[in-house]
């Protein structure tokens, strides 16, 4: 029953008080089970059917799907339950205690993005779900901040095909219809160690990496010349060399060298296409030095994403907000949800607050976010 729900601010407070950090380091990584239980209980109180889905390959992480109504189509509202780790020395407030000051709600996950679920629950107080003509789905995912395992697994296993979806990431209520992807690789070269007094007796991995980097930089230039998407502020795929390490002493021939790099592909470029371009670029080195160069993923790749600009979802949201859709450079779960249905990224709070000490959401977003959620439910589930 709706009267069982706590007030909006208490829902928000409970979400922030329930830690659900995602991290690649096992010591920092936390299960989101308690947060999923909170959400599941609240949606059950509203009469929703709730399914909790364990996510394989994670450390006790779960997705939750709350649904009301049956039949084809409908609306999916989605978000992730996890947060990034926090630097205790840089926060001036308790990250797990919601505090309000000067028109801002402070706490880890206030903007990115536990707060979105508080907005959904509060908006549903004013929606008579018994009158829905199409189903309404609420998806809460795991591990967006690391592997995006929750969204990947849900998209791979669900039979749902809603009419459209909105992911409530912090966009300052500016609708986003496209973003670049992210591929991060480790280039590793295995040389042969030896004393520096006789270089011919070894294979210097740093020298081989120098050769490889030349080919990678040529790929970077080719990407800039061949691919264009003018809506982006950086209108081509970027390639960055971010980290390199090799050798251990000035008088030893370097046996190992490792380079970390990333590519941010634009929408429409497939992951297979990018892997092929990288392998082709490195082929001269691999052919000259067989078995010494390997390419490994640092994390599962994220493709670029785009919602068709002429889709009904774009038209409806632009009309409701009086704002045109945008494209952004950061990544979300949208590429995976987009495999199910046309998807927009749209939510309260600023992306500039994401992953920052003293993260906050401005209270000016409360009323318009609540109204927007009610409006999109009415449009896509009542008509």
Curated annotation (Swiss-Prot):
Catalytic activity: N(2)-acetyl-L-ornithine + H2O = L-ornithine + acetate
Swiss-Prot/TrEMBL cofactor(s): Zn(2+); Co(2+); glutathione
PROSITE patterns xref list: ARGE_DAPE_CPG2_1 (PS00758), ARGE_DAPE_CPG2_2 (PS00759)
Gene Ontology MF terms: acetylornithine deacetylase activity; zinc ion binding
A Gene Ontology cellular-component term: cytoplasm
Gene3D superfamilies (alphabetical): 3.30.70.360, Zn peptidases
Binding site for Zn(2+) 1: 80, 112, 169
Enzyme Commission code(s) on record: 3.5.1.16
Active site per database record: 82, 144
Domain of life: Bacteria
Pathway the protein acts in: Amino-acid biosynthesis; L-arginine biosynthesis; L-ornithine from N(2)-acetyl-L-ornithine (linear): step 1/1
Cofactor note: Binds 2 Zn(2+) or Co(2+) ions per subunit.
Coiled-coil parts of chain: none
Compartmental location: Cytoplasm
GO biological process: L-arginine biosynthetic process
Binding-site positions, Zn(2+) 2: 112, 145, 355
Assigned keywords, A-Z: Amino-acid biosynthesis, Arginine biosynthesis, Cobalt, Cytoplasm, Hydrolase, Metal-binding, Zinc
HAMAP family: ArgE
Stated family: Belongs to the peptidase M20A family. ArgE subfamily.
Xref: PANTHER family: ACETYLORNITHINE DEACETYLASE
Protein task: Catalyzes the hydrolysis of the amide bond of N(2)-acetylated L-amino acids. Cleaves the acetyl group from N-acetyl-L-ornithine to form L-ornithine, an intermediate in L-arginine biosynthesis pathway, and a branchpoint in the synthesis of polyamines.
UniProt subunit comment: Homodimer.
Name this polypeptide is given: Acetylornithine deacetylase
Organism for this UniProt entry: Shigella flexneri serotype 5b (strain 8401)
């Amino acid at each position: 029953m709706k009267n069982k729900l706590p007030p909006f601010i208490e829902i928000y407070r409970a979400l922030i008080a329930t830690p659900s950090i995602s991290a690649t380091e096992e010591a920092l990584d936390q299960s989101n089970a308690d947060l999923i239980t909170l959400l599941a209980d609240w949606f059950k109180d509203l009469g929703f059917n709730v399914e909790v889905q364990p996510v394989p390959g994670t450390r006790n992480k779960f997705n939750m799907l709350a649904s009301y109504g049956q039949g084809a189509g409908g609306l999916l509202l989605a978000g992730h339950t996890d947060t990034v780790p926090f630097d205790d020395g840089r926060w001036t407030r308790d990250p797990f205690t919601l505090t309000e000051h000067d028109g801002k709600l402070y706490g880890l996950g206030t903007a990115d993005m536990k707060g979105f679920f508080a907005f959904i629950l509060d908006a549903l107080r004013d929606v008579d779900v018994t009158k829905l003509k199409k189903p309404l789905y609420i998806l809460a995912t795991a591990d967006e901040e690391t592997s995006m395992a929750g969204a990947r697994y849900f998209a791979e296993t669900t039979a749902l095909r809603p009419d459209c979806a909105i992911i409530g990431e912090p966009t300052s209520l500016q609708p986003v219809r496209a973003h670049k992807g992210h591929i991060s690789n480790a280039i590793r070269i295995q040389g042969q160690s030896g004393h520096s007094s006789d270089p011919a007796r070894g294979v210097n991995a740093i020298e081989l990496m120098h050769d490889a980097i030349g080919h990678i930089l040529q790929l970077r230039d080719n990407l800039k010349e061949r691919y264009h998407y003018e809506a982006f502020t950086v209108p081509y795929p970027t390639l960055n060399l971010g980290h390199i390490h090799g050798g251990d002493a000035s008088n030893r021939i370097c046996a190992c060298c490792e380079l970390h790099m990333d590519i941010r592909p634009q929408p429409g470029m497939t992951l297979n296409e990018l892997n092929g371009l990288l392998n082709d670029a490195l082929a001269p080195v691999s052919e000259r030095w067989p078995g010494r160069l390997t390419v490994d993923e640092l994390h599962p790749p994220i493709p670029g994403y785009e919602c068709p600009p002429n889709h009904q979802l774009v038209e409806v949201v632009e009309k409701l907000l009086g704002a045109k859709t945008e494209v952004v450079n950061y990544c979300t779960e949208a590429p995976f949800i987009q495999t199910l249905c046309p998807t927009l990224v749209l939510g309260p709070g600023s992306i500039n607050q994401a992953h920052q000490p003293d993260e906050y959401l401005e209270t000016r977003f409360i009323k318009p976010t609540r109204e927007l959620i009610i409006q999109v439910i009415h449009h896509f589930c009542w008509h």
